[in-house]
Amino acid sequence: MVESAPANRRGFYSSWSLATQGLATTFGGVVALGLSAWLPFATGSETVMAEWGWRVPFFIGVLLAPIGCWLRLSLENDVPEPVRNKKAATSESAFSLLLQHKATIVNGVLLAIGSTVATYISLFYYGTWAAKYLAMPQHYSHAAMLLAGVITFVGALLVGMLCDSVGRKKLILISRVMVLICSWPSFWLLVNYPSPGMLLTVVFVMVSFTTLGGVPVMLLISELLPKRIRALGFALVYSIGVAIFGGFAQYFATQSIVLLDSLTAPAWYLGGGTLLSMLALLYVKEPAKELQ
């Protein structure tokens, strides 16, 4: 999407990646909220979701998988221009190319860590945490996820357009500063004033700030990498930053509660990831209008 977009529309084009994730989260929230309301009524059991109802969304996901495969196979690939110097191209391995851009890869990983930690905590963990530790009804957790999905979908498209007018780094910096400022107060407010309204308010605020930085981060990383290694480099950045620090975010957050014996402990993980991302901004330049 980034390579096929006009130079002044790359932000909006790339924003659809995060926007569709928000749409998927919204759909997941609707399904979870609907099942948590309908299954107990239909079966007469209040524990049906814990017993087997939680498997239903996974079954729906399996049914949707072929559609995703079909959509991916139907997309046109950007065929690179013929390589003029085959000998020079083949002698230079992908590994050596990555080494030449190792600073960009490291900065990309740090940027991705801040973005993905904030995304996983704000979109998915607040609701789960509130249900587990604050004894809030599970359907409020699903409602929080639904709200997060809607904000991500709408917000990503708006931020994408904003990227094209004000740049990437400024939005990332504002996002990171606000997430850092709000990370501990968000958990503290929920611990001291636990209510569904407070949960939804916290999710609304944190997801909004997270989305503000999520779109420009992924765009910036792809723009910093040269075309020859853009796919490989982005995959490496994504696998380390997202799969490890994002995929295990809820586990790390939960373990921090055990280690520090504090319900606000996940704020340290959220704040730490955010600080790493801000550190990378010091060494990253605003990309040129034309891609390499």
In which residue ranges do the predicted regions lie?
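Glycine-rich segments within core transmembrane alpha-helices of 12-TM secondary carriers
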Residues: 11-36, 237-249
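A membrane-interface helix-boundary motif in multi-pass transporters
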Residues: 37-59, 253-272
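Multi-pass alpha-helical transporter architecture, strongest
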Residues: 68-75, 271-292
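Extracytoplasmic gate region of multi-pass secondary transporters
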Residues: 102-152, 245-250
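Helix-to-loop junctions at the C-terminal end of transmembrane segments
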Residues: 156-168
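Cytoplasmic membrane-interface "Motif A"-like loop-to-helix N-cap segments
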Residues: 165-177
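C-terminal ends and interior cores of transmembrane alpha-helices
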Residues: 178-193
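A late C-terminal transmembrane helix in Major Facilitator Superfamily
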Residues: 227-259
